[in-house]
Design a protein with these regions (language model features):
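Short, surface-exposed amphipathic charged segments that create phosphate/polyanion-binding patches used
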Residues: 177-187, 236-251
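A short acidic (Asp/Glu
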Residues: 146-150, 175-176, 208-212, 238-240
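Phosphate-handling DNA/RNA-contact segment within nucleic-acid enzymes
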Residues: 62-193
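TOPRIM metal-binding catalytic domain and adjacent DNA-binding surface shared by DnaG-type primases
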Residues: 2-84, 88-91, 127-130, 219, ...
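Acidic beta-strand-to-loop metal/phosphate-binding motif
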Residues: 137, 194-206, 229
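A generic structural motif
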Residues: 166-168, 224-234
Length: 272
């Protein structure tokens, strides 16, 4: 008799977290617009599904309104021609956002809204990591998106691994779970099932020092930590191919004091 292979369900990349947005964003379009994205995102290999997953918006002309603490006047901070990147806490509540210039002509590539909390208090995409066993720690939002794309393509990792971002190469906070900071967020994730952390920060020589000290702090929370390296100095996950990211993921080395020492001497070679 003829056996029929079961029809493969097509898996769609989508977040299951209900988002709340008390933060008023500058005037914007939700993405995608009629299935399309600004060229800037297309060039960075961001698909419409990814743009939706990360709740990206497009501000053509818009201002962030804030009260100047010195004059008590309401002012407007211009976010024209920027991709708005909302930042959520672990409960999916929007706390702040970033605006990434897409023209290449702006004085500042990233703009941060005045009078809102610093993004460095939060783990970017942390709300999608709640309940996952493993997180990949990246620096910037586009690094997180690059890793998400790679992991989503890898069926064995898809449901268990989530990338998160620290907005730079240091972790905020101390060992207090109630505090609104990054280490507190790691403790909360641990309480919700997080077991493994893979560090995928930039691999320049100075950067490895920062990576190791962050790895040490996370390991001290009782979490398994591995250190990954993309293999090329200065390459970050936002610019790497999915193959490079997965290779780095599988090749990551468990953090030990010895590895930290070796990295001080040999730099990136210690991680390859």
């Amino acid at each position: 008799s003829q056996g029929w292979a079961p029809k493969k369900e097509e898996v769609v990349l989508a977040s299951k977290v209900e988002l709340e947005g008390p933060v008023a964003l500058p005037r914007h379009y939700e993405l995608p617009i009629d299935g399309r994205l600004p060229d800037y995102l297309v060039e960075r290999h961001i698909s419409p599904d990814l743009a939706k997953y990360f709740d990206l918006r497009y501000c053509v002309e818009g201002k962030h309104a804030y009260v100047d603490p010195y004059t008590d006047q309401v002012k407007g901070q211009v976010f024209d021609m920027r991709i708005l990147i909302p930042v959520y806490d672990l409960d999916g509540v929007m706390k702040t956002f970033q605006g990434r210039d897409i023209t290449g002509a702006a004085e500042r590539r990233y703009l941060f809204p005045m009078q809102l909390p610093a993004s460095g208090k939060f783990l970017y995409n942390g709300h999608n990591a709640v309940g996952k066993q493993t997180v990949v720690v990246c620096e910037g939002a586009f690094d997180v998106m690059g890793v998400k794309r790679a992991i989503f393509d890898e069926e064995t990792l898809r449901d268990y691994v989530e990338p998160i971002g620290t907005f730079g190469m240091h972790l905020s906070g101390n060992m207090n779970e109630d505090a609104e900071d990054q280490l507190g967020a790691f403790l909360t994730l641990k309480a919700r099932g997080l077991r493994n952390v893979i560090m995928m920060w930039d691999s320049e020589k100075q950067a490895i020092r920062n990576t190791m000290s962050a790895a040490r702090r996370i390991a001290s929370l009782g979490i398994n930590v591995k250190v990954a390296c993309l293999g090329e100095e200065g390459l970050d996950p936002g610019d790497a191919t999915p193959e490079q990211i997965l290779k780095a993921y599988y090749r990551a080395k468990p953090y030990t004091k010895q590895l930290e020492l070796l990295a001080k001497i040999k730099g990136i070679a210690a991680l390859l």
